[in-house]
Amino acid sequence: MSSYENHRALDGLTLGKSTDYRDNYDASLLQGVPRSLNRDPLGLTADNLPFHGADIWTLYELSWLNSHGLPQIAIGHVELDYTSVNLIESKSFKLYLNSFNQTRFDTWETVRQTLERDLRACAQGNVSVKLHRLDELEGLPVAHFHGACIDDQDISIDNYQFTASYLQHAVSGEKRVEETLVSHLLKSNCLITHQPDWGSIQIQYRGRKIDREKLLRYLVSFRHHNEFHEQCVERIFNDLLRFCQPETLSVYARYTRRGGLDINPWRSNTDFVPATGRLARQ
């Protein structure tokens, strides 16, 4: 259980509660969650963050009516800056997008601007939105995380409670390496509903070599951990930085979609350009 799971800031969320679905535009459906909820326990404040990054959302179920009443569909690409006061709660995002379904908009650009304006207001930070027609994306190959996969290790695991201390003494020697490690075994649970969240994670670093067995045990220990996607990625980044002290570090997770949305947070303290193609499970 996270230390803030019962925080009063979460009381008003529609997540985990029975809700009515509206199909006429309503920006008030969007709900934010303060990033400080998980950053404060990690000792992170807005003026001392050890990373930059973004939360990348893909919107697969976005539809509205044009000025003649003809339905339009698009796939949306949203990037929410790491400095925003709030992250966007995903169920509220889904409900908000549903409210576009029977609403008329004059142009695609009006839809894009509306999304960007409302998300910025909810997040209290920078947000960019792009809309793609289906023919722009059809035929694109399934992407994959570049790097060495650490999943096929012949080890026994019987602890699935979050254990940051697995990373203690995970580096040894003075030789510096630069490598990219990948795992598809990341699984955590929604902070509120405890429903499973499945993801793949890519870790790029330069520094003393990280023990792959200890890293895998650490990642698997998220299996019963309750936090939002964005919070898990920041926790992983912070733990790796604290225990392994790499010179450079980038952590990027791509989660499977739920409710027509997928969330793909990344955090880095160096130059890093995240690949945005969907993975096999997305």
UniProtKB/Swiss-Prot annotation:
The lineage of its organism: Bacteria, Pseudomonadati, Pseudomonadota, Gammaproteobacteria, Enterobacterales. It is an enzyme of class 1 (oxidoreductase). Its EC number is 1.7.1.13. It catalyses: 7-aminomethyl-7-carbaguanine + 2 NADP(+) = 7-cyano-7-deazaguanine + 2 NADPH + 3 H(+). Its main location: cytoplasm. This is NADPH-dependent 7-cyano-7-deazaguanine reductase. One of its GO terms (molecular function) is preQ1 synthase activity. Substrate binds at residues 88-90, 229-230. Pathway: tRNA modification; tRNA-queuosine biosynthesis. GO terms for biological process: queuosine biosynthetic process; tRNA modification. Catalyzes the NADPH-dependent reduction of 7-cyano-7-deazaguanine (preQ0) to 7-aminomethyl-7-deazaguanine (preQ1). PANTHER family: NADPH-DEPENDENT 7-CYANO-7-DEAZAGUANINE REDUCTASE. Keywords: Cytoplasm, NADP, Oxidoreductase, Queuosine biosynthesis. One of its GO terms (cellular component) is cytoplasm.
